[in-house]
Amino acid sequence: MNWMILLWITLGIVIGIAIGFFIARKTMMSYLKKNPPINEQMLRVMLMQMGQNPSQKKINQMMKAMQKQQSK
């Protein structure tokens, strides 16, 4: 009888972890679809919209600064 309770508890934990993983994965995918990460092309367009001339050096500096900020 004791082993049956332990089996059900273990099975419940495994099923809970699996369901949690798929829910978290779906949530993250929908978040990334709504808010894609910024790439160099997006930065170039953003700078052009602000009236600045986007040089490759400036874009590289901004990308490094954003990556440094995200790693904090």
Curated annotation (Swiss-Prot):
One of its GO terms (cellular component) is plasma membrane. Keywords: Membrane, Transmembrane, Transmembrane helix. Belongs to the UPF0154 family. The keyword GTP-binding does not apply. This is UPF0154 protein BH2350. It comes from the Bacteria. It comes from Halalkalibacterium halodurans (strain ATCC BAA-125 / DSM 18197 / FERM 7344 / JCM 9153 / C-125) (Bacillus halodurans). It is a single-pass membrane protein. The keyword Transcription does not apply. HAMAP family: UPF0154. It is found in: Membrane. The chain crosses the membrane at residues 3-23.
